[in-house]
Amino acid sequence: MTHFPNLFSEGRIGNLVIRNRIVMPPMATNLANEDGSVSQRLIDYYVARARGGVGLIILENVQVDYPQGKNVACQLRLDDDKYMAGFFELAEAVHSYGAKIFMQIHHAGRQTTPGITEGLQPVAPSPVPCSFLGTQPRELTINEIEEIIQKFVDAAVRAKGAMFDGIELHGAHGYLIGQFMSPRTNRRVDKYGGSFERRMRFPLEIIRRIKEAVGEDYPISFRFSADEFVEGGNTLEEGKQIAKMLEEAGVHVLHVSAGIYESMPTLLEPSRFEQGWRVYLAEEIKKVVNIPVITVGVIREPEFAEKIIAEGRADFVAVGRGLIADPEWPKKAKEGRQNEIRKCISCNIGCIGGRVFQNLRLRCTVNPVAGREGVYSEIKQAPVKKKVVVVGGGPAGMQAAITAAKRGHQVILYEKKQHLGGQLEIASASPGKAKIKWFRDWLEAELSRAGVEVRSGVTADAETIAALSPDYVILATGSEPVTPRIKGAEKENTFVFQAWDVLAGKVSFDKDEEVVVIGGGLVGCETAHYLAEKGAKVTIVEMLSDIAIDMEPISRFDMMQQFTKLGISARTGKVVTEILPRGVAAVGKEGKQDFIRAHKVVLAIGQSPVGNELKKTLEDKGIDVRVIGDAYNVGKIIDAVSSGFQVAWQI
């Protein structure tokens, strides 16, 4: 029996038959070789998703104009025939597992920086700066526009020659094609700008000439932002007009997205966005066209995806970050094992934050194998079965226990609390972070599936552990909040609290109560957000020049917008010198004194590792001890999970 019959029914794009309605949308990975060629690491990554049962893979954005059109550090290239062999190998590998593959061809336009384009000034239809990146583009000449059109055509011809099943034109998210279509970014007065029809000339000319070059029947997908969610940009009404014109031009499928860089959270949603919030856009577009429509946007559960198809709101569902988190999402859903799916929590840390803003290779908080599928293609059994004791039931400890058990070891996990989760429990209490509970629940269920013996509500001291005669002990004892050396921060003060206790619901606050949060890092800002949503008047005091600098940038961008709405204020560049019953005293860089009124004060100064004494005692007993997660080095969930996986893999 096939579960989710609509989701797993065959779909059709033009004459191309696709085995189900699940699409992996294009998502940049930085897994290409530095010269823009296809790497084995990239092939392994896509093969894992094809093997996992996805119907159609749309390859991440491939630049047609190097380096002018480049927008990420290790971006694929197809501006020369020499790159075709790698793409052919990729397509062949994906096809061997029954999936189809399209290539998204792309030009960044103004949404890039000289640091990426090897010093070249970004180009655009008009010299409208990108405020998100702080870049000033120059206006393209008519001759340059004609040259870029030809480069799109050449890339499409090469894609077909490399055995790709179709192409996708990236007209969404404010890149060059979208810039021509939008009145916000296209202020030309020649044949490529002005009226709606002239703004559409650039994409329509690309489509016309591609069809002439590759044939009428070669599938073309067009991705566009049905609503740019920014002042002066295209709205859904313009999106409907765009869709009609694209259908008339011979496009075979519409991939309906949203947003541009200036409205970044609408295209790369942080965790507060609800599942499927963008589906209504595809639904409205579908009403005005007769070609298939792909919807996208925080689609995490097969039950939700099934309903979209069953209700006719879209013809295909794009599962993006969900397939990074779990390449077997389709396979598990089809087999009725949807409860085993490791769902994306929309943290954006490894797939977007580190990749886009630090030029790192793709990673995933919940999937430590993402981007390294060739190395960890399968959990290999250890040559000798060992007894492994894990101390600590947070994300690092649970991941370590799961990995060690899957490698064939006997694993016992100790957690001093009655329930598992560690800091995941606290993190999920922050506004918009409820998805973190998905991961906590998955880890707990996976412990059971892996056969880990869990002993919760037990404090594992050295004697208890030694009595088990373990071969290895993995310490995942986490961290604890730091109490600063500030006068008045003493624990006996009844108006001073730790941020963790606030997020854990251990402290009550009255509406309109004035609260000062000392520390403007991630924990401090999330605590301030939590309190403000409960009606408190919150001020953050931070010694650095800005707040939330340790946050993933898109989530930070979104949070700052929420702070403005909630009236949260920040005093930066100030050091708190004393906590008093009616507020806090602080001093600025130039020695200027300040006093911020408060009924209650919350400490969010940071954390320090826990477990050093236990480690030393165990080692003195001759036990092999490995330390992971915050107990080793305080970091984010992604660091904890990765360290747990790596240490367990090596045992």
Curated annotation (Swiss-Prot):
Catalytic residues as annotated in Swiss-Prot or TrEMBL: Y175 (proton donor)
Cofactor(s) annotated in UniProt: FMN; FAD; [4Fe-4S] cluster
UniProt keyword list: 4Fe-4S, FAD, Flavoprotein, FMN, Iron, Iron-sulfur, Metal-binding, NAD, Oxidoreductase
One GO process term, biological-process aspect: catabolic process
InterPro entries for this protein: Aldolase_TIM, FAD/NAD-bd_sf, FAD/NAD-binding_dom, NADH:flavin_oxidoreductase, OxRdtase_FMN_N
Record note on quaternary structure: Homohexamer.
Family assignment from sequence similarity: In the N-terminal section; belongs to the NADH:flavin oxidoreductase/NADH oxidase family.
Protein name: NADH oxidase
Species of provenance: Thermoanaerobacter brockii (Thermoanaerobium brockii)
Organism taxonomic ancestry: Bacteria, Bacillati, Bacillota, Clostridia, Thermoanaerobacterales
